[in-house]
Swiss-Prot record:
SUPFAM superfamilies: Prokaryotic type KH domain (KH-domain type II), Ribosomal protein S3 C-terminal domain. The gene is rpsC. Residues 38-106 form the KH type-2 domain. Belongs to the universal ribosomal protein uS3 family. Part of the 30S ribosomal subunit. Forms a tight complex with proteins S10 and S14. Pfam families: KH_2, Ribosomal_S3_C. One of its GO terms (biological process) is translation. This is Small ribosomal subunit protein uS3. InterPro entries: KH_dom, KH_dom-like_a/b, KH_dom_type_2, KH_sf_prok-type, Ribosomal_S3_C_sf, Ribosomal_uS3_bac-typ, Ribosomal_uS3_C, Ribosomal_uS3_CS. Coiled coil: none annotated. CDD domains: KH-II_30S_S3. GO terms for cellular component: cytosolic small ribosomal subunit.
Amino acid sequence: MGQKVHPYGFRLGYTKNWLSRWFSSKDYPAFVYEDDSIRKYVKEKIFHAGVSKIEIERAGGKIRLIIHTARPGIIIGRKGVEIEKLREDLRRKFNKEFALEVSEIRRPETDAQLVAENIAQQLERRVAFRRAMKRIVGLARKFGAEGIKVACAGRLAGAEIARTEWYRDGRVPLQTLRADIDYGVARANTTYGVIGIKVWIFKGEILDHEVEQ
């Protein structure tokens, strides 16, 4: 039976770049754990800002975060007040110096992570899962996605037995390395239990094989 490899891990160094970029010979496990803690902390603090991914770079004891968000204004705040507050909160919690950079996501409708989280929020508001999936798929296609696949797994519509249902529109070539596949996962905590959501979005082919910056 065929299994699906993670679309990012499959393309690392070819068309995708690492989200954590640093080198360490001794403190590697501690840094990996710290990176995960930083991402969770930032995501919780600014969840309402539509954060897709957080890149982490380390150099000389200083940590640089690149936050990809659909609403940069919420993170930065008036005259940079909010981003400065976030930087100070990070410094106090992790006892390290941080440099924060905000990158705007121009089309959140074609960002897989934001799409997955959007579906999760709809399911938690008791929107029918098929309606939520079809609406999201239509939006992504309207905003330029060449293909999209959405999968929901769990006690869908309160069913006794958990199952997986998926919906696809367009082309999603997971085995083509030059295909620019965006991938996102989210979980919806409903009254019937947890529902897992996975989203694959095909944005076109990268023909020059340059790793994304």
